[in-house]
A protein has these predicted regions:
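Active-site mouth of glycoside hydrolases
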Residues: 2-209
């Protein structure tokens, strides 16, 4: 755990960050963003260029465990490519490992071609990461530990990443209290890796205490 002095030092050494929760315009969910069938460097580059023109310097983005599980080497290469595009336009990245948000009908993601975005209808086919079934089934958490540690070890000293968000909105939707075991574990795993970057978790409205 960082001391107050470490946190203040990090704050002084870094700029004022201003950015977005990022997902490309061609992706209905984060599975589509990372999947082999739809990852689009062209769209990402266009949007990073736009972000730079607006004075933004950071992007917060959910990584999809299902895509990693299908092909870990592909996922790490793709994340590296995404980071390189962002870096080209001066945009730092806050990757997110897990996410309980499920705005659509699917609470467990599947890889492959995803539904197309619908104009004016946000996230109608959204899916969380890793999916509710794995969150509540602690027998699967060994797989998630491997995912977190492999990705974080690969990028733990990478200056293109400015913060790791370990879990976005734990307990959101139908997950009250059921996310706590995984949330506690992911902080333990991250601290075992001991990345150069700080770690955090984006709280959900109901779990601020």
């Amino acid at each position: 755990v960082w001391s107050t002095e470490q946190a203040q030092k990090w704050g002084k050494e870094n700029p004022w960050y201003c950015g977005v929760n990022y997902i490309p315009a061609n992706a209905i969910n984060y599975t589509a963003m990372w999947d082999k069938t739809s990852f689009s460097p062209e769209v990402i580059e266009k949007e990073m260029k736009l972000m730079k023109s607006l004075g933004m310097n950071c992007a917060r983005v959910v990584m999809q465990y299902a895509v990693y599980e299908e092909d870990p080497a592909y996922f790490i290469r793709t994340l590296d490519r995404f980071l390189s595009i962002c870096n080209k336009y001066g945009v730092k990245v806050m990757p997110i490992f897990f996410d309980d948000c499920a705005f659509g009908v699917n609470t467990d993601p599947t890889v492959g071609k995803q539904p197309e975005p619908l104009e004016g209808w946000y996230a109608w086919a959204w899916s969380p990461s890793p999916g509710y079934s794995m969150v509540v089934d602690e027998r699967t958490h060994g797989k998630l530990e491997k995912y977190v540690k492999e990705v974080m070890n690969h990028f733990k000293n990478d200056p293109r990443i400015f913060v790791w968000d370990l879990y976005n909105e734990p307990t959101n939707t139908t997950m009250p209290e059921r996310s706590w075991p995984l949330l506690r574990k992911v902080f333990t795993w991250a601290r075992e890796v001991n990345p150069k970057q700080p770690i955090t978790s984006g709280l959900w409205n109901g779990n601020k205490e």
